[in-house]
Amino acid sequence: MKERKKIKVLFRLRSIEMGGVPRVVLDLLRNLPKEKFDLTLMLNLYQGELVSEIPEDIKLIVVEKGREQMSKNPFIQKIQLVMRRIRLEIYKQFPSLLYALKVKEDYDIEVSPGYAEFEMVLNSPNKKSKKVGWFHTDVSYDNNKSRVMKRINLMKKFDWMIFGAKQTRQVIEDIYGVSYPKSSVIYNVIKLSESRSKANAFEVDYPIRPVFSSMGRLHSRKGYSALMRVHKRLLDNGLKHSVAVIGGGSEMENLKKQRKELGVEETFMLLDSQKNPWPYIKASDYFVMPSESESYPLTIGEVMGLEKPIISTNVGGIPEMIEDGVDGVLVDCNEDAIYEAMKQFLTDKNLVDRITQGTKNADEKFDEKKIYQQITEVFENVLKN
């Protein structure tokens, strides 16, 4: 019997730092059916916390070294970084040169897992490959309309677009009047077994309880400044607790300064990025997500899998994940609403017990096999058109 030819798929990523998009890509590389697909990952920069998690059986194309492989001499490293930036700019202007030097095979499908890779994939000199894009962003909170329109127009050029939540696609039509007939909504895979396993790696002992944990990049729209003010207000009203935030980012110094000004250095813990955040989440009593915008955050499902009662702002695709009052609590995106929900968790044990019981259905809610099948069908069908 003649062996069926595998579909050759190239995933492009800028780098592989800790974050939602790289984690999704790594999961697909591990779990899409190898009997159907020949998978390759192409990194512009071989750097990031997740480098060690790249599957060994996956072909890897590296365009440029990461900082970790560079000289430890600051002067030499500075020169290396400048040269790297120049080479990357040349490759951006002349993608044919990049492919001639680095990409030795022709691929059937080239994938942009997020908007950062849109132009990389669309400018591929391989005109025969089908281009598939992913979009995970809630555009309603982006005030830079020209940037949003650029992304919207780039998405029209893909042979197929995958949106990470129904809301992510719908909001583009509602605000900008643009629809995507060649698209589908596929939720990101949430690896409940993985987060559960990693949660047992070590013990975490918080000094002040109960603890609200939270996890995300320290970006202004993630709402941590507001969360800190809510935390202070709860303490001032006699509700003892602490907050543990796992994540690094551009707002770290501002948050440290605010923490000092509010006098909550002992109770508002900034734990920075952690390669394994799950023991910190497991050791907490509740989880809070104060974001102004999200798409379909993996963290919500993973935390639910650890049976932690969740408070989240009612934004993006989160209402597609949390059933309000059943397996979590959804609140408006403002400090008063977050305050009232956190106060309720601290004072209403029956509510917390009910939400905790609701989280026990997480496995049924987030069925990963169904998602791998949906992606497989997209890749197979896009080649037929």
Predicted feature residues:
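Short hydrophobic beta-strand element within catalytic cores of glycosyltransferases
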Residues: 309-312, 322
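Conserved acidic donor-binding segment of nucleotide-sugar-dependent glycosyltransferases
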Residues: 324-325, 329-335, 344-350
